[in-house]
Amino acid sequence: MKKKYLVEKEREKESARDFNTPLFAPSRKNLLPVTPDYDYMRSGALNSFASAVCEGAFLAAGGILSPIFRLKIVGRENLCGVGGAIITSNHISPFDCALVKRAVGRRRMKITVADFNNWDNLGGAILRASGTMPMGGGIACRKNLSDAIKASVNDGRFVLFYPEGALWWCYEKPRPLLDGAFYSAAKNNVPVVPMFFTFEDYGRERDGIRKKRFTLHIGKPIYPDTALSVHQNTVRMKELTYSFNLATYIKAYGHEPEYLPEVAVAADTADEKVAAVAAAERQPAKTPDKNAAKPTERRPEPNERRTPAPRPSPSYPSYPAGDMTPAPEYGYEYPGEEAVPGFQSAGGGVAAFTITRKI
């Protein structure tokens, strides 16, 4: 598939604010089912031997791919002294897990993947031996995966999550983060090590898309706060990770991320959808009028039946364009509403509480 078409699909989904789903419906043919007794830890001598061989080959693959992607790794020193941990990264290439493996070196690493990557063939067997952990549906399957993650981090391993969800090829901007990685870190009392890929253009390819040099930025570990609950730590580490992603983007590209205007796309064909997105881009951005009068709500008449309002869908961080306040303990810039000694959750985002930490 041409990369130009992938970029068009990314622009279409960005305009629809559909940040966490695949660009195309994944194939579910020839998959190995993820059952409640799925062997994530690969018990047995034969499985252990196969895992050792494939993990070594996986590390070698990262070394081979690094010059192809012209990979540069920044912040590798932040991994020193870190035991078992959750690693987060933006998902921008089918091979980015090998590049992350290149960064962590000989440290053993598990990789969480969607169930549609659990192929029932030789390729799937190699991936499983290399450390992939497919996510299954249902409470029993999720508990089994949770137990495997706990065993992995307790054994000193890294577990790689892609909290942005689906793969978007070379997508530069930070996307909304899902909770799973941060809940796992909070529940198991281990740090999150945030990573973020940025790109530098060079040359052009045949379909008009410029080639990319990859840089993998490794942030400082974000440790759970023992004074907070699992839920509060989930929110806290999630927002600090987004803070790192945003600050890394701004430092790499020299400006804040600008997202396409939101449009409601109702077209049936890909060409019509792309045209709708392009037309929305040509429209000037609307600036809200702060002095405009707010509409007054009509009071219901006596005995009038009112239709209940629909429940709003879960909201993601609002990605504010400004209001960057420091989080000096972690060395990152955090998007907040006002300066505080520690950090503040984004107003209108996934949480609305403030935590003050001593510096």
Regions found by a protein language model. Name each.
Residues A60-A61, A129-G136, E164-L167:
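Short, basic, glycine/proline-bearing loop/turn elements
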Residues I64-S66, V104, L127, S152, ...:
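A generic structural signal for well-ordered alpha-helical segments
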